[in-house]
A protein has these predicted regions:
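A short local loop/turn or secondary-structure capping micro-motif enriched for an aromatic residue
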Residues: 27, 86-89, 121-124
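Short, surface-exposed beta-strand-loop junctions and turns on beta-sheet-rich folds
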Residues: 38-39, 99, 118-122
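Charged phosphate-binding loop/patch that engages nucleotide di/tri-phosphates or the phosphate backbone
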Residues: 108-125
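A short acidic Gly-Thr/Ser loop motif
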Residues: 22-28
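Aspartyl protease catalytic core from the pepsin/retropepsin fold
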Residues: 1-22, 58-108
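Cysteine-centered loop/knuckle micro-motif
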Residues: 30-32
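A compact, surface-exposed functional segment
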Residues: 34-69
Length: 125
């Protein structure tokens, strides 16, 4: 399991905000705190059926997702995140996001290993 923190610009309808993100290979999906959803003015949708998300010390029920836009290495990337009240971080980038964009973590050196910018942009097509 790897954990890395990095500040990234998030683009919302209301404004652009630098957000401290946790890149977490142990989390299958991405999660966002409701306060950040409101601050950015993000679009959300109700899940057809609430899901229970397991956390390190228990679990929580989630009923909404948010469409998120992030800038990484000069490229705009899309993500979908569970809106999770009581989240300890503002944003957690999970394994689905990391795999989709072929992002690797180097926890020992605390850095992200990104594909070439051209290849990262091709994933969006």
């Amino acid at each position: 399991m790897g954990l890395i923190r990095k500040k990234l610009p998030f683009i919302g309808r209301r404004k652009k905000i630098e957000v401290e993100c946790l890149f977490d290979t142990g989390a299958s999906s991405s999660s966002i705190c409701p306060e950040l959803v409101r601050a950015l003015g993000l679009s959300t949708a109700d899940l057809a059926k609430p899901v229970r998300i397991r956390l390190g010390k228990g679990s929580t029920q989630v009923s909404r997702i948010a469409a998120v836009t992030i800038r990484l290495n000069g490229t705009t990337l899309a993500d979908t995140a569970y809106v999770m009240p009581g989240l300890s971080e503002e944003y957690i980038l999970g394994a689905e996001f990391l795999e989709r964009y072929d992002i690797r973590l180097d926890p020992k050196r605390r850095r992200l290993l990104l594909p070439p910018k051209r290849r990262l942009a091709l994933v969006l097509v």
